[in-house]
Structure formats: structure tokens, C-alpha cells
Amino acid sequence: MLKPMNLTCNGVHSLSPSTKRNVMKVLMFGWEFPPHILGGLGTASYGITKGLSLQPDVHITFCLPKPWGDEDKSFMNIIGMSETPVVWRDVDYDYVKQRLGDRMSPELYYQLRDNIYADFNYRLTDDLGCIEFSGRYPDNLQDEINNYSIVAGVIARQQEYDIIHAHDWLTYPAGIHAKNVSGKPLVIHVHATDFDRSRGNVNPTVYSIEKDGMDHADCIMCVSELTRRTVIEHYHQDPAKCIAMHNAVYPLSDEVKQMVAQRKPHTERKERVVTFLGRITMQKGPEYFVEAASLVLQRTRNVRFCMAGSGDMLNAMIEMAAQKGIADRFFFPGFMKGKQVYEVFRDSDVYVMPSVSEPFGISPLEAMQCG
């Protein structure tokens, strides 16, 4: 988890709840949240919201592209962009309740509807006047980012809040829109930059969105000092408004501890297991894992390799293992979440992280918890 702190960036330090108000209300924009996560962003979002919620003077409203209804709402409010109207629709209460289910109350729907832009017209809306979101990272991701920002304007007009917090580049335009609407300070949370994701082959569109978010931010939270230096040097930001806020993990539950303790001793294992766990993308260096596996298997066959995760390089890695004649020594279980992560670590002898750039990986911390 992330431990809460009083931010001291320009324009933000004056909002310390202990000195100005009884409760600090945070409007937070995110892209994923447990149990429906696609990577570390969802895990980190849970950690910071859960940690902040432990403070009696912090109240959080968390915005998601597409909630599924089974998210933990016990410690904060969740607003779905896919349930927020941007175009007026004359619909009755019972129909709204039936359509939205547990994802949003009809009362909130009508309150949000009262704050749409009167002159706004958007043809890609449903019968409730809402825009559809995939809740993932689709091929038309840029369209979803733009639509997310449109919806953020409605939410920013309706909600009461003291500060805006935007997670990663996907939500920076939304954070900027909310700041322009409200005049409230904007904190952006840099979980990674495109310099990390692209091995230096930066996408100019992504870079532009990232820099725009940083330029408009009153405070820039970076997950490591490495990321902070990248933000300062490559995005030309004022060091005074950039702080390092490291990720962390929660202690293992008793249930997971018992599961991890069931690990077989080395003497009872016929083969050693070496594991890669993470997004199978350029940033994480999965091809180096396969290359290293090939070298190891030239010396011994008493090893199996697990590449757990999903990503745009998964098929290429499966093909690479086959081309090197080591496919019989490889296991590709797909994306792991929840207890599955700890089951993989429990059954592993070595965890390898061949990332080309790693702002602050959560998986290594989870691996360390398993001994």
C-alpha cells in the first residue's frame, strides 16, 4: 500500500486537512481497479485508496471507465464513466435503476445529468446518454481517453472535492479538464513514462499527453526517484513540484500465508522452476528471459520456466521458445491475479525480472513476501 502524507508541492500543501478543514475530499481518476486488473496500475490504485481511506479526514471518489459492480466500495465511492450521462435523456427512475443495477444509484445518475453541458451533442451515446467504455486497453484507446475526459467534465461539475488526483497518462486529460472546471489543484501520479514503456522509441502522441498533464499539474507524484529524474530531465518539469512516492504491498493475509507455507522442500522437487511474472511487453524484456532460458537449458535440463502474464508480445515469446527448441520446458499460464500470483511464487525457486526499465515494480515485492 501507499502511506498517506501531506503533499508539499506548490499549491497543494495549503490543503492539509489538519489545518484547513475537517475532511479532505479527493476526486481521483483511474483506469483499472481490483478485482478486474490488467497490471500493476490497478494494484497500486487499490493500495493508495485503501491507505488514504484509513485516515479519518480523507474522503475519496474514484472514477473508473467501466466498473463491473463487484469492486470494493466499503471505503470510497466509485463512479463509472460508462454510467455517467453526457447527453440528456428523458428516462424514468425504474428504467434507470434496472439498467444501472449496482453500478450507480438512480439518484446519482440524475444529479450528474443535471450537470451535463447543455449545448453538448455526441452521437455515440446509449439510451441513458452515456458513452460506452471497454474497461480495458482497446485498439481505439485514444478515443476512450478523449471520451473519459469528456465525462470527467460532467463529474467535475457535480462532485464536491478539494483536490484532483489522476493516475497515469490515460487520465491526465481528465484531470486537466476537472482542474479547468473547478480551479482545484491537480496531482498527477506517474506510474511510468513512455520512455519506460517504449525503450526510448517514444510515441509523440503519448509524450504530448504526458507532458501536458505534467505542465498542468500542481504536484507530480513519481513511483521512484528514477521516474522523478525522468520527469525532470525528459519532460522539463520543475524539481520543486516532483516528489518520489514509492509503491508497497500489504502484508500477506493468514490464508495466503498458509498457502505459501505449503511449498514443498527443495529436496522433494524433481525440477527447479524459474519464473517471469508481469506484462509480456517490450518494457519488461520478456525476450531476454527466453534467451537466458535457452542458455541455461544448454547446461541442464532439470529446469522449467514459467512466463506468467499477458501482453502484446505473448505470442512472439511462445514462437520464440518453439524456435529455440525449448517449448517443452516452458509454461505460459496467462494473466495471474489475486491468490494465483502467490501460488506461482510459492511453486517457484527463482524469480527473474529482466525489465529494460522498471519505474517501481510491485511483483518483486510480492515475490519477496513468499521467501
Model-derived features with residue positions:
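Conserved donor-binding/catalytic core segment of Leloir-type glycosyltransferases
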Residues: 266-293
